[in-house]
Design a protein with these regions (language model features):
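Ribonuclease/tRNase effector modules and their secretory precursors
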Residues: 1-124
Length: 124
């Protein structure tokens, strides 16, 4: 388990309250990304910390109220880093963690922006 960054965006704290701001990425999740999302990790994995720490968009997952999509435009594409939020008050020792990461095309990004609740947009 490796700490890859910290959630710094105030909108996340405003929405969830006291969270574990450190975000980890496990070896198992890296394997998942490599197996399920082709070359995305090899090509764009280095942008995971930047995407979590300085996202362009943060959207809420419809299926899990404690999961957020951190999206950032990098190079010629968008990166989506899905993070499971852990609460500080739970005292379980768990940290917020990356579930997956993959590239998003503009059409998919627009669809997500339309269908999911947005808690942050750096264009606003």
């Amino acid at each position: 388990m490796k700490v890859i960054g910290r959630i710094k965006n105030q909108c996340v704290f405003d929405h969830w309250g006291q969270i574990q701001s450190e975000v980890v990425l496990t070896a198992e999740r890296i394997r998942h990304i490599c197996e399920d999302h082709n070359d995305d990790y090899e090509e764009y994995g280095r942008y995971i910390p930047e995407t979590v720490e300085i996202p362009n968009l943060i959207l809420l997952d419809k299926k899990d109220q404690n999961t957020a999509l951190f999206i950032r435009h990098v190079e010629d594409t968008n990166i989506n880093v899905v993070v499971k939020i852990a609460y500080a008050f739970e005292n379980t020792g768990r940290k917020s963690s990356v579930i997956t990461m993959y590239r998003l095309g503009e059409k998919t990004k627009a669809r997500l922006m339309k269908n999911l609740k947005m808690i942050y947009n750096d264009q606003d």
